[in-house]
């Protein structure tokens, strides 16, 4: 007997499912919809360390036009549609790893905090941490890739007091100086500067500035990645011979800025430098098969990057429920 499914039979099946759903409507109404998603986290092992990825929620950018630059808008929308993504609303995740090294708990980037600059779907990091059983006081070090609001906005709470009472903070000095500069309050960068000053100045006495190439914490090495911001940095995280690269904002989108790595992103301080940096570092990562943890890729943002004839391709790693 030949086993085949025709388009007609699939459509008939779909119609049948629709009818059964309608018939069951009264039963479904007895169980009210919750209408929300829980805070979420994901754990995996890295050598002798345990990594907990916590979500700050989703960051909707809206239509790609004007944000992703240098490629015709129709082509950008087709790239999204071809990958079953909305061509009308680009949505980024916000994934922060917390690395438990045994003697230290290290958080990378703090999310949007209480700001709703990009809408109501951000600002979940503290809830995600609580769900994962991690308290703010457990964090010993907060490592910042750069000083944009979606990465430093969760340093202080609604009362403008630091949320991580026992933490030291690590950032590139060039980024701190640039984004806390009072002289930029009258410039188009005002909103970014206001949020940077609000979050970074209250912890100024606990800030440590790292240098390019420096292993400033055991197992955490800074790698300068300028362009997105002047001091934007990615980090190599290593434990017992196992490593991953935390990419920060080296690439915001797993399709657009990998398939077309020289496409420009409107939030980059220096878009050309950002593209050059992206290609250079992704070449190194792909050639050495270094696993990556990306702040803005689809949850939980952990996977691998391979070089293609025109750019790069991201392969998400399957989630493992056994540690």
Regions found by a protein language model. Name each.
Residues 56-57, 110-113, 147, 174-175, ...:
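Active-site metal-binding loops of divalent metal-dependent hydrolases
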Residues 30-32, 123, 128-134, 138-150, 178, 194-202, 206, 213-215, ...:
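Metallo-beta-lactamase
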Residues 153-160:
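Metal-dependent catalytic neighborhoods of phosphoester/phosphodiester hydrolases
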């Amino acid at each position: 007997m030949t086993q085949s499914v025709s388009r007609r039979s699939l459509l008939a099946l779909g119609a049948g499912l629709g009818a059964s759903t309608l018939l069951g409507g009264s039963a479904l109404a007895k169980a009210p919809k919750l209408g929300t998603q829980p805070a979420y986290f994901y754990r995996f092992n890295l050598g002798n360390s345990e990594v907990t990825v916590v979500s700050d929620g989703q960051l909707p950018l809206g239509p790609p036009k004007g944000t992703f630059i240098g490629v015709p808008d129709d082509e950008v929308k087709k790239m999204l549609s071809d990958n079953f993504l909305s061509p009308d609303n680009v949505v980024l995740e916000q994934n922060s790893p917390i690395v438990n090294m045994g003697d230290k708990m290290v958080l990378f980037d703090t999310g949007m905090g209480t700001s709703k600059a990009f809408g109501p779907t951000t600002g979940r990091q503290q809830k995600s941490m609580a769900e994962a059983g991690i308290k703010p006081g457990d964090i010993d070090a907060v490592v910042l890739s750069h000083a944009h609001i979606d990465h430093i906005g969760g340093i202080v709470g609604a009362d403008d007091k630091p949320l991580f009472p026992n933490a030291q903070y690590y950032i590139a000095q060039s980024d701190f100086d640039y984004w806390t500069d009072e002289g930029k309050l009258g410039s188009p960068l005002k909103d970014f500067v206001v949020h940077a000053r609000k979050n970074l100045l209250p912890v100024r006495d606990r800030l440590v500035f790292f240098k390019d190439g420096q292993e400033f914490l055991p197992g955490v090495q800074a790698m300068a990645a300028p362009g997105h911001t002047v001091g934007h940095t990615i980090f190599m995280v290593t434990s017992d011979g196992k490593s991953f690269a935390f990419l920060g904002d080296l690439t915001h989108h797993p399709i657009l800025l990998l398939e077309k790595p020289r496409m420009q992103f409107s939030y980059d301080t220096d878009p050309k430098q950002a593209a050059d940096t992206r290609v250079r570092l992704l070449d190194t990562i792909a050639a050495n098969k270094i696993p990556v943890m990306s702040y803005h890729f689809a949850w939980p943002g952990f996977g691998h990057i391979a070089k293609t004839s025109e750019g790069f391709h991201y392969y998400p790693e399957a989630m493992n429920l056994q540690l």
